[in-house]
Structures are given as C-alpha cells and as structure tokens.
Amino acid sequence: MSKQLKITLKKSAIGRPSKQRDTLRGMGLSKINKAVVLKDCTEIRGMINKVSHLVSCEEVEGVE
C-alpha cells in the first residue's frame, strides 16, 4: 500500500498569478470543492506548497 494525498480546491483561482493557476491545472483542480487523489511524492508536495492557501490536503491510504 502506498500513501496518497486527497487535495481539495477551497478557494477560487480567479485573480491569482498564472503560475498558481497552472499549478492547480496541473494537479487536475478546476472548480471549487473538486477533489483529486494523487500519489504522495516530492513533486506533488512542491505543487501543494505553491498553492497551500487555495487548497486543503489530507493523507489517505491507497492501494495501487
């Protein structure tokens, strides 16, 4: 079993810099309250750090 992260968009990307909008798009987040489950790796953690004020994150156990 591998660790995964459930990431939910909590605030809108309207009026945010294009780098932040691109980061959200790269994670698959487009609408408020949309959630995605991604693997827990350093790349995803870095993306979360860039937009931490817009998203919420929690760890979930996943089976691949």
UniProtKB/Swiss-Prot annotation:
Pfam families: Ribosomal_L30. GO terms for molecular function: structural constituent of ribosome. The keyword Transcription regulation does not apply. The keyword Cell inner membrane does not apply. Keywords: Ribonucleoprotein, Ribosomal protein. One of its GO terms (biological process) is translation. One of its GO terms (cellular component) is cytosolic large ribosomal subunit. It comes from the Bacteria. HAMAP family: Ribosomal_uL30_B. PANTHER family: LARGE RIBOSOMAL SUBUNIT PROTEIN UL30M, MITOCHONDRIAL RIBOSOMAL PROTEIN L30. Belongs to the universal ribosomal protein uL30 family. Part of the 50S ribosomal subunit. This is Large ribosomal subunit protein uL30. It comes from Syntrophus aciditrophicus (strain SB).
